[in-house]
Amino acid sequence: GGMKSLFGRAFSGETLFLNKYTAIQPSMIALGSSFPGDILVYDVSQGDIIVQKSSYLASEETVKREISFSKKGTIGFFGGEGFIMNRYFGSGLLFIEIDGTAIEYDLNPGEEMVVNTGNLVAMSSSCHIDVVSVKGIKNKFLGGEGFFNTVVKGPGHVIVQTMPISTLAESLSGFMPQND
């Protein structure tokens, strides 16, 4: 959708250009993700969804996107995955790329869930997020989970992933040859 969409995609960390496929007769298209894991199909007409900027795979043309900022600037600075996410709305199917397996939760009003920042993939636009510091010096330096966690507050639907690519890369780094 034009220069405005192009700049929006660039600002949110997505690829600048999107491929458009149009069927001229009944047919199928195969989608593959860039990382081993699930591809989640979400019907946007069921409600707006906020998605991690790197998790967009594909969508129908009727799905609209806009940049979604956290209300707290510290989320972007300290949160790891960044505070810039994308809100998808309109109608049609959205295909979300998941690193590892997708696990879905429904939160009641006021119910909170604490997740590793890199594990949060998507949430209903009715959810609110905040980033909190991990308590305790031992937990911060020896826990292996980082300094911050994301708190998601309901009501709404939350999708987390089991193996963010950053976690896998960190796990494999010990097995890589070292240059001396």
Model-derived features: where do they sit?
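Composition-driven recognition of glycine/serine/threonine/acidic- and proline-rich low-complexity segments
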Residues: 1-180
